[in-house]
Design a protein with these regions (language model features):
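Signature tryptophan residues that serve as conserved aromatic anchors
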Residues: 1-4, 26, 69, 99-101, ...
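Structural motif
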Residues: 59-62, 171
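Short, charged, amphipathic alpha-helices and their helix-cap/turn boundaries
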Residues: 61-75
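Surface-exposed recognition segments
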Residues: 34-35, 42-55, 74-77, 94-191
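Short aromatic-cysteine micro-motif
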Residues: 1-36, 71-92, 178-179
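Conserved beta-strand positions that form and line the central face of beta-propeller blades
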Residues: 37, 66-69, 80-83, 116, ...
Length: 191
């Protein structure tokens, strides 16, 4: 289950601002400085188990399985970060394992708005939140850097016993989480 909105409510023991990150920051971090579907070599179509040709030819999964926890190698559960190699930024599990809950509201036209001059890409209007990156049940084609979906608020709260329904956690979804971002330590940046 996901503790919704928990990053913004984290105890501020370090004296820094913390938050869930916006979708574009997450995509940049997941790409590890690259501009390709994955931060490693490969084509989503080659890794995917979907499609007509998969009846005759196996998917090429050696490279993706080294970096991503997804349906083919997850054993139907999340895995520890040490199970995969890091991306060029040194980050693990940026794709797959769990979908990332983002600070943005979902807008299906988000990428067509604003053009190249967007200074604050955070979308604050809408009903559902952005989740991205696929999870341990996803096909390889759905664990790309740009893979984006949205929360299904009512469906993810069906068995929540609280009345009114909780605003803090989703009772009916597995494979979703969030990353906390915080402002950098000025002492480290000066070195």
């Amino acid at each position: 289950m996901l503790q919704k909105h928990s990053a913004s409510g984290c105890p501020n023991k370090q004296g820094k601002n913390t938050a869930c990150r916006p979708r574009q920051n997450g995509e940049y971090a997941a790409r590890g400085g690259t501009e390709t579907p994955y931060f490693f070599t490969g084509n989503p179509k080659d890794f995917s188990d979907q499609g007509f040709w998969r009846k005759f030819f196996d998917a090429k999964t050696d490279s993706i399985s080294s970096f991503v926890i997804y349906a083919k190698n997850s054993k139907n559960r999340t895995q520890e970060p040490g199970e995969v190699k890091a991306n060029p930024f040194g980050l693990k599990n940026m794709l797959g394992n769990v979908m990332e809950y983002c600070a943005d509201k979902y807008d299906p036209k988000a990428y067509s708005k604003g053009g190249d001059n967007v200074t604050n890409p955070l979308i604050t209007e809408g009903e559902e939140w952005v989740v991205r990156g696929g999870n341990y049940t996803s096909d390889a084609a759905d664990v790309r850097s740009a893979a984006r979906d949205y929360t299904k608020h009512d469906a993810w709260l069906k068995t929540d016993p609280q009345q009114p329904k909780s605003i803090w956690w989703y009772s009916d979804i597995r494979g979703i989480g969030f990353r906390v971002v915080c402002e950098p330590d000025p002492a480290i940046g000066a070195k």
